[in-house]
A protein has these predicted regions:
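Domain-level marker for long, solvent-exposed, non-transmembrane regions
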Residues: 1-109
Length: 109
């Protein structure tokens, strides 16, 4: 999954990033990942362009791309995603597999 957070200058990289929907329900965070994968490569990668995100080794072909809307209050490592993108993620059949493997890249400003 690629989280496009461009335009959200307040987003800061974190060891334990979280993605929530507009109602605050977590759609990606520590509860979704394998401890082994997180220790090996971190919960997510960070980059500055969509092009580099698409070619990152942790991302497979045809990644789900979601757009970050804002950060959650003062928690600048918690990105709020739209409810419609969150629904797409929850409906993806491989949803738990790629999240468990920390196959997430966050594109920053």
């Amino acid at each position: 999954m690629i989280v496009d957070a461009k335009g959200l200058s307040e987003v800061k990289p974190a060891i334990v990033p979280k993605i929530v929907d507009e109602s605050g329900q977590e759609i990606y965070g520590p509860a979704f990942v394998s401890r082994e994968y997180a220790l090996q490569a971190g919960m997510s990668g960070y980059t500055h362009t969509l092009a580099s995100a698409k070619t990152d080794p942790r991302i497979k072909d045809n990644p789900l791309i979601v757009k970050g809307l804002k950060t959650k209050n003062l928690e600048r490592s918690v990105i709020v995603d739209s409810n419609s993108d969150a629904a797409k993620l929850r409906q993806a059949s491989e949803h738990l597999s790629f999240l468990r493997k920390c196959s997430v890249i966050i594109v920053l400003e």
